[in-house]
Amino acid sequence: IRYPKKIPAGKRLKDLILNVDFAPTLAEFAGIRMEDVQGDSFVKNLEGKTPADWRKEIYYRYWTNHAIRPAHFAIRSDRYKLIFYYARNLDMTDTENFDFTPSWDFYDLQNDPHENHNAYNDPKYAPVIKQMKKDMLNLRKEVGDTDEKYPEMQELLEKYYYK
C-alpha cells in the first residue's frame, strides 16, 4: 500500500495481514468508521505502530478443490505453517473430484522458507504442531468456519485431525 500523505512508497510489513483487513484499512484512510467487520485495520501497523495485541497467527481456507491444489485450511505464524489438505468439494462449484487421502504439511519457514521439506512427521516439531492444531481450532471457531453443515468434514476431522 502506498499513501503519499502517510505511507512512503516501498513500505513493507512483517506483520501478519489477512485479505479481510484491507476493507477496514482503506475505510480508515478514507475517514469511514467500519464496525462489526471480520478484518482489522492495519493503518497503525503501516505507521510503524503495530498494536501489542496484533495477531501472532492467521487462519485461512482454500475452498476450491483441484488436483494441483487440493482444498485445505491452514494456520501460519511468522515462523511456522501448518496445512490440512482435506480435498473435498463440499458445496463448491468449479472443483474436481479425484482420489486423495487427507494429509498434513508443516513447514518451519525460518529454516525452510521455500517450503521444500514437509516436517510434519519430524518429532522435534511435535509440540509446535500440537499447539498449532489447538490454535487452528480456536481460530476456525473465531471466524465461524466450523463445517457444521458438512458431516463428511466432521468424519474427516475425527479421523485425521485429532490423531
Feature locations, PLM:
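A structural signal for well-ordered alpha-helical segments within the folded catalytic domains
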Residues: 17-24, 40, 77, 101-104, ...
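Long, internal low-complexity/basic segments
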Residues: 22, 101, 119-163
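Substrate-binding rim/cap in mid-to-C-terminal beta-strand-loop elements of soluble/periplasmic
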Residues: 1-36, 40-52, 78
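WW-domain-binding short linear motifs
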Residues: 56-60, 154
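Active-site rim elements
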Residues: 6-17, 29-35, 66-71, 94, ...
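C-terminal, low-complexity/hydrophilic appendages and adjacent surface loops
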Residues: 62-121, 156-163
